[in-house]
């Protein structure tokens, strides 16, 4: 959890009563119908008051307000992943605060008075709280003020019981990571190495071509919000799958295009997409191979474009599936 110096605490404290009053004014207002494709959990009367009828819990009473565990916060109503613990910070406002959300997991809606912006679970429309901009509490200048009662928490040790992983390789891992991390339902995208026999390889060993590894990205995703096929399609659209052992100006075996499947279903999806692209005139060279151990790359390679503010130099999204090849 992030630690911040809250020079705006007094201003925020003064707004508590106003915020709570505005939220409580919505109590009793039920919005939207349940979707048939979502499994809704049974809620307690208090959970329903907040999540369905847009109420709020009292400040400084929620179980996650100062909670600092490592893991993922999910929607109490449908279980969809909402926030990473790395994006939580102590705003001293009485409710859990986050300065970012998992891509596509949270949607925004203006309150009736036009003054505040409500945040809801993008999967089930469950009420989460409100989002505030411009407070300068963290570098993102964003604060998601969320009711603890609207969330559940999955500890990092239990993540693989609830979410899925996929491994893609398409040139320099910086660019692949950048675009996949921004995809809906992706909880994390990690740059690393796979395909070789050397244990815990270094970047230099991979570049030497002696390790047998290639640059790859491991994606942790929420199956409630996206699918393996959607991610694989995105992968084929953010790199050129027709280039052999290279991607743009980056040349070498470590930059080859590959999908590492974890089961027969993933293999079938990957092979289907390769056939679709070949049918459109692309000569796809992407290898479809069984997944082997993935090794996380050095810290300097993680979130490279997010940290530097630069843009990928050898990856450019192209709509390959919907548009015919020119």
Regions found by a protein language model. Name each.
Residues 13-24:
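Hydrophobic helical h-region of N-terminal Sec-dependent signal peptides
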Residues 2-15:
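Bacterial N-terminal signal peptides that target proteins for export
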Residues 23-326:
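Flexible coil/turn and secondary-structure edge motifs
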